[in-house]
Swiss-Prot record:
Taxonomic path: Eukaryota, Metazoa, Ecdysozoa, Arthropoda, Hexapoda
Xref: Pfam families: AdoHcyase, AdoHcyase_NAD
Residues annotated as binding substrate: 56, 131, 156, 186, 190
Keywords: Hydrolase, NAD, One-carbon metabolism
UniProt protein name: Adenosylhomocysteinase
Cofactor(s) needed by this chain: NAD(+)
EC number, UniProt record: 3.13.2.1
Entry GO MF terms: adenosylhomocysteinase activity
GO annotations of cellular component type: cytosol
Substrates-to-products reaction catalysed: S-adenosyl-L-homocysteine + H2O = L-homocysteine + adenosine
């Protein structure tokens, strides 16, 4: 049986999606510069890219950039709640085989990913663009015969990168991979500034809660946690941090946050945000400690940070307030308000990150795909990062939009610093 040309929630939303894509393009200068620079060269001609990344308006601009560069593209979303149905419809209407809709079941989610493996002409994928590792894991586990044709993969997020390093250590990685997440222009921008705005958008749309004056817990103080803590503090919240890493804990303390354990924080706070990418962060004993109508949400990639299963099995009652907002009544009489079923709150309850910051991340994705497609022989099987020079190029492409005037090194200054006047300006180990 032939697979469908696409599967989306409502193709009639395509016109609405196209209007928003036009707006987003103006906010994504990095991707538009890639089209201008590489489009005429069709530098990705012959690439058959299977993408598994949140099917949003911003992702639509990424998809059409890859196509403009000569690639064939098929797409699924990497989260059951993150698809923006008008974006998916616009891509389907434009002829892109896209398999994504908001509110997929877990079974439908895996079905969607499987549809992207074989292209309409019967040929398999030869490139992967992933977010979280589900597509990568599926190919390795179920279709190892496809690995020999795949030139490489680029991975978007922290969770997926951890998965890649684990696969490589265990000898299971079958292709070169570029870790896009650890490009400075991704992790220090998308993870921090993106979450700083989109977290509050998700919480506010879901609950209309006043942040000011409330005690808020942020679990984890990496780049995502830093952005979330800044957002909550900026709205007047009193922010507590939980951490396992003494360096991150010290950073948080010296920014003026109280650093404590979830056992202690769960007795005091009213809003909980997990950002760790780890499992078992908020457990049954923590729910039992919480105040009535505590709000609990996650902004890490997978839904394993909050023990939703415990809530489902132990709550006396569950009331769905509206899509992705559930109120659980516990045996002690208190209620827990869970957002997006413990999945990404900024995409489940709002629209995700803004276009401008996603232009940083997605420009890195485009450059990673170009690197792997055109210079495959330079990349052994393993996990790689983009060169510093490309990282700086991504940043430079976004300066004009913000009216930034960059100082230029003189020849004497460049000689004094022993740097090329045109960069790169920092060593690979520099942390920013």
């Amino acid at each position: 049986m032939a697979k469908p040309a696409y599967k989306v929630a409502d193709i009639s939303l395509a016109e609405f999606g196209r209007k928003e894509i036009v707006l987003a393009e103006n906010e994504m200068p990095g991707l538009m510069a890639c089209r201008q620079k590489y489009g005429p060269l069709k530098i990705l001609k012959g690439a058959r890219i299977a993408g598994c990344l949140h099917m949003t308006i911003q992702t639509a601009v990424l998809i059409e950039t890859l196509i403009e560069l000569g690639a064939e593209v098929q797409w699924s979303s990497c989260n059951i709640f993150s698809t923006q149905d008008h974006a998916a419809a616009a891509m389907a209407k434009a002829g892109v085989p896209v398999y994504a809709w908001k509110g997929e079941t877990d079974e439908e989610y895996m079905w969607c990913i499987r549809q992207t493996l074989i292209f309409p002409d019967g040929k398999p994928l030869n490139m992967i663009l992933d977010d979280g590792g589900d597509l990568t894991n599926l190919v390795h586990a179920e279709h190892p015969e496809l690995l020999k044709e795949i030139r490489g993969l680029s991975e978007e997020t922290t969770t997926g990168v951890h998965n890649l390093y684990k696969m490589f250590r265990e000898g299971r990685l079958g292709m070169p991979a570029i870790n896009v997440n650890d490009s400075v222009t991704k992790s220090k921008f998308d993870n921090l500034y993106g979450c700083r705005e989109s977290l509050l958008d998700g919480i506010k749309r879901a609950t209309d809660v006043m942040i000011a004056g409330k005690v808020c817990v942020v679990a984890g103080y990496g780049d995502v946690g830093k952005g979330c803590a800044q957002a909550l503090r900026g709205s007047g919240g009193r922010v507590l941090i939980t951490e396992i890493d003494p360096i991150n804990a010290l950073q948080a303390a010296m920014e003026g946050y109280e650093v404590t354990t979830m056992e202690e924080a769960s007795k005091e706070a009213q809003i909980f945000v997990t950002t760790t990418g780890c499992t078992d962060i908020i457990m049954g004993e923590h729910f039992l400690n919480m105040k009535d109508d505590s709000i609990v949400c996650n902004i890490g990639h997978f839904d394993c940070e909050i023990n939703v299963t415990w809530l489902q099995e132990n709550a006396v009652e569950k009331v769905n307030i509206k899509p992705q907002v559930d109120r659980y009544r516990l045996a002690n009489g208190n209620h827990i308000i869970l957002l997006a079923e413990g999945r990404l709150v900024n995409l489940g309850c709002a629209m995700g990150h803004s276009s401008f910051v996603m232009s940083n991340s997605f420009t890195n994705q485009v450059l990673a795909q170009i690197e792997l497609w055109t210079n495959r022989e330079q990349y052994a099987i393993g996990v790689h990062v983009l060169p510093k020079k490309l990282d700086e190029e991504v940043a430079a492409l976004h300066l004009d939009k913000l009216g930034v005037k960059l100082t230029k090194l003189s020849a004497r200054q460049a000689e004094y610093l022993n740097l090329p006047a045109e960069g790169p300006y920092k060593p690979e180990h520099y942390r920013y």
